[in-house]
Amino acid sequence: MANSKEVKSFLWTQALRRELGQYCSTVKSSIIKDAQSLLHSLDFSEVSNIQRLMRKDKRNDSDLKRLRDLNQAVFNLVELKSTQQKNVLRVGKLTSDDLLVLAADLDRLKNKVMRTERPQTLGVYMGNLTNQQLDQRKRLLDMIGISNARNAPRPGADGVVRVWDVKDSSLLNNQFGTMPSLTLACMSKQGQYELNDVVQSLTDLGLVYAAKYPNAMDLEKLTQAHPVLSIIDVSKSSINVSGYNFSLSAAVKAGACMLDGGNMLETLKVTPQNLEDILASMLKVKRAHSMFVSDTPGDRNPYENLLYKVCLSGNGWPYIACRTSLTGRAWDNTVVDLGPPIDLSQNKQMSPAKPKGAGHGMPSGLTMSQILALKDLMAAVDPNAKTWIDIEGRAEDPVEIAFYQPQTGAYIHFYREPTDAKQFKQDSKYSHGIDIGDLFNVQPGLTSAVLELLPPNMVLTCQGSEDIRRLLDSQGRKDIKLIDVLMSKSEARKFEDEVWDKFGFLCKIHTGHVVEKKKRGNKEEITPHCALLDCLMYEAASTGRFSPGSIRAVLPRDMVFRAVTEKVAL
């Protein structure tokens, strides 16, 4: 019967807002403070890596560990957290009828969530089947008399089923929720916008949400006034996409928290003292508007969503706080008990780490001692060995250059601060994802010095030679020859995930959100391009295998980056 009922989604949301408004609070300043802490101290190169891992067809225990480690880093940097709390509901503020309804709803919600998040059943293969393969598999199973292919997992928008292949699936719990502070920080850092611009844009989105659920058309109109909103991807699923995504739902949640004095459910705060009052108010609205828990797998309706979040942790902000440290699910942490009272245990909150300050030095060229040291270092380059070269940026304004010799494992990798900031921002959005602020401390003059010290008449291998040829010619190195392997884009990037998994730690500045333009104005999120890792994957693609050996940097870090000292106020 529940399936035949109509979910009046926004009407339910408004009704719950009105009834629970007294438990809501203004959280804007706290969220902005947490966002600033994340901007100052979170490793956004690892954020970019996690976003890449979440696009993989199949993710394993190693990927999950990286996600959990980054989630823990976020937890340590923010103040808005949910604390582990065992909620035991008894007759008192809640009647026995209330408790029976809550117990039934939690049980029904448990069944729905388990079917949605873990759709596999006995005999269903949870692998990387494309949409076409799934259809063929269904026909074959029907032909031999097995008709349970309908239980196969649903493919994503690109036709590929994405699954977690992990030993302990309980470790996935509470690792995927979005947080407004994290959404603000990622939009600012990876979109390369001022935090204030992000706040203003999400405030407008929140104002729309006060009257209706924002959709793609609303977002498109708002983007005209707030370009930062172009980073939002309306095609993103809301299930198992991690808190580092740019989905519309994540942005709407953040926008709701930017409204001062509102009664938005997102700003609800639950404590052990008001938990039963909140649940009683929820049941009152449920009865008045005939709300229910649906048996159909998929996204939760407003009542289901609120019930799950409130019962997951009875101490904190159920919608917006970091809950990565929580264990169990809503039905584990909130139970109905008609027995005598018992003491409730409560874990202590972890203290947030303080963001480290940073300072900027003034740029200077290579000193004589640096030039002499560079000459000695460049002597390690084998003039006769196969050598890959790749650059990011424009030939006349490169921002990253890498050389790699597969035979010895030696590589040269350095950066350059751009002169055309406007063009750099465009290239960052559609190619390399570098934040210009991360290039302020690179060593100036290194590009010309390294190119000048390359052995004469050297042969370099590349994927696309036009920009590289122009760069070499501009530095007077017309003697250097180029071999362009001319692979297709898909061929060249065949081993992209393997290379990033193994060597992603070598480069930490590709932190931005990068998209690729598609037909009819569409766009697709892609992994940022890194000159060094591109060289490694081009070598793997050209040989047809990825056989990672040991690699070593020719240039030490203090040659690539200038020393930075903090100024002391006198």
UniProtKB/Swiss-Prot annotation:
Residues where Mn(2+) binds: 390, 392, 534
Enzyme class label: hydrolase
Region called Disordered, residue ranges: 342-361
Subcellular location: Virion; Host cytoplasm
Region (Binding site for the cap structure m7GTP): 54-241
Listed GO biological process terms: negative stranded viral RNA replication; RNA-templated viral transcription; symbiont-mediated suppression of host cytoplasmic pattern recognition receptor signaling pathway via inhibition of IKBKE activity
Keyword Hydrolase applies: yes
Example of a GO cellular component annotation carried by this entry: helical viral capsid
Sites annotated Important for exonuclease activity: 467
GO molecular function: hydrolase activity; metal ion binding; RNA binding
Entry superkingdom: Viruses
EC number, as in UniProt: 3.1.13.-
Region forming the signal peptide: none
Binding site for Zn(2+): 400, 507, 510, 530
Keyword terms: Capsid protein, Helical capsid protein, Host cytoplasm, Host-virus interaction, Hydrolase, Inhibition of host IKBKE by virus, Inhibition of host innate immune response by virus, Inhibition of host RLR pathway by virus, Interferon antiviral system evasion, Manganese, Metal-binding, Ribonucleoprotein, RNA-binding, Viral immunoevasion, Viral nucleoprotein, Virion, Zinc
Subunit structure: Homomultimerizes to form the nucleocapsid. Binds to viral genomic RNA. Interacts with glycoprotein G2. Interacts with protein Z; this interaction probably directs the encapsidated genome to budding sites. Interacts with protein L; this interaction does not interfere with Z-L interaction. Interacts with host IKBKE (via Protein kinase domain); the interaction inhibits IKBKE kinase activity.
UniProt free text on domains: The N-terminal region is important for the cap-binding activity while the C-terminal region contains the 3'-5' exoribonuclease activity. A CCHE zinc binding site is present in the C-terminal region and may thus contribute to the substrate binding and/or the specificity of the exonuclease activity.
Record function comment: Encapsidates the genome, protecting it from nucleases. The encapsidated genomic RNA is termed the nucleocapsid (NC). Serves as template for viral transcription and replication. The increased presence of protein N in host cell does not seem to trigger the switch from transcription to replication as observed in other negative strain RNA viruses.
Recorded family membership: Belongs to the arenaviridae nucleocapsid protein family.
Entry protein name: Nucleoprotein
Organismal lineage: Viruses, Riboviria, Orthornavirae, Negarnaviricota, Polyploviricotina
Gene name of the record: N
